[in-house]
């Protein structure tokens, strides 16, 4: 079978089949134009990596259901799902999570969920902006951080497993380079929660594989977001082998790959995205 006669799902095509490009991005976009739109649930979508991820998936034709503690901002978030597919939720509130899952399920209305991206995370600082270490972090802060960074991904995955099964979907957990080393700025609770999320990713990959659901993680290093000051960037860049910080768009592209058919045999992985900082 020649390449021109293949549809991009790997089966022999015909003249009536849509002309789907080889790369996963254009393939999804073409399928969406022909009525086969994929759906993504994305937490922490209002800024940084989450915002870049929502934008990329939207450009590829996906329907985006977003979750964040902020109301939907149509000026900053240029995806057509908009307010109708946004769930405003405070993930540190244990009573709010089941309500958020129920609202997402209602909006899915029994349709398949192709990807769940657990991106939301918090990293509290001391009142003076300094790092909270294992001696100075209050118990309430430990509980809040673990609720958002670890428990929320567990509950979203458990609550949406039936919809993920329908699509043989993909889950991507956003961990961090700080889960494997002490960081000068990230607090102890944040770092520990990200290490736990990496471990959880392996556990989930094992448990969800029976349903055809893949579970992976990405571990960003220093990424240029609103919270990274020029002074901090100047401090960090020289110690990174590529001598620069990354961009949210670069992280979003790896997330997209992990949610695509191109990564159909990848599960249980944690992909470092840090310019070689881990080596």
Segment roles from a protein language model:
Residues 127-143, 236:
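Substrate-binding pocket helix/loop in short-chain dehydrogenase/reductase
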Residues 181, 256, 267-279:
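Short C-terminal tail/terminal secondary-structure segment
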Residues 46-47:
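Conserved glycine-rich cofactor-binding loop
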Residues 1-36:
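N-terminal structured subdomain of primase-like DNA metabolism proteins
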Residues 168, 209, 214, 266-268:
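Short, small/polar-rich loop/turn modules that mediate ligand/substrate recognition or access, typified
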Residues 162, 206-207, 264:
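Alpha-helical segment proximal to the catalytic Tyr-Lys
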Residues 157, 193, 201:
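Active-site helix of classical SDR
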